[in-house]
Amino acid sequence: MAHKRLLSCTASEVKTLTAAELKQAIKASEGRIILAETVVTKAPLIEGVSNAEMMRAFSADMLLLNEYDLSTKFIHSLPAMDAPIAYLKELTGRPMGLNLEPVDPSAEALEDWIDLPEGRRATVENFQAANREGFDFLVLTGNPSTGVSHQAIEATVRLAKQHFKGLVFAGKMHSAGTGEKVVSEAHLLAYMAAGADGVLIPSVGTVPGVREDQVARIADQVKDLGG
């Protein structure tokens, strides 16, 4: 299809976007894209309506599933089915993404870590499974108490770009149970060098010490690198 803003794409057009076309459509929207995340293991806000549908109804442009296990395919309050992601994409008509977590057993533990299920880990098998399920993008990140490190994220970006067909984003919104800085300019730029399509940066003030000048500087550099 011709280059078009994601904001202007119909559901039928979104369905046909390649990874490169999706990235271009996001860029063409000039910072106006809203990505909304939902924890699929929790009950929906309204019985009978998935949170993905709710987010789309309130104008989310991209949808991100957190705690989705590729082994069980469980989504709270959704009927059991073989292809829940295809079903949600049909209901919403939006690009659908997934959080996967690069656990680092050697990282400094700030707290006790949870035993993360295999279906939520950032592995080659799960990248391939995400392809089969039709996810449009991955976010390599860490939930609380999971033991995800910047070093593990960087290594996994390279792996994901080899085995996943969609876009790959990377970064941390909190420590994920490790003793390292949440926002590291060097690591965020290293993700881009490793092939990431974009990075996660906490909004100013949402994480202690995250400042406007710091975020602006990183954002400018990431954009210069194609993110």
Language-model-detected regions and their locations in the chain:
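A generic, well-ordered mixed alpha/beta core segment in the N-terminal half of proteins
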Residues: 68, 83-102, 113, 117-125
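Proline-centered loop/turn at the N-terminus of a beta-strand
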Residues: 33, 95-97, 166-169, 227
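Glycine/small-residue-rich loop that forms an oxyanion/phosphate-binding "nest" at active or ligand-binding sites
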Residues: 105-106
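Short beta-strand segments
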Residues: 37-38, 97-101, 141, 171-172
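Short, glycine-rich nucleotide/cofactor-binding loops
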Residues: 39-43
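Alpha/beta enzyme core
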Residues: 46-72, 77, 109-226
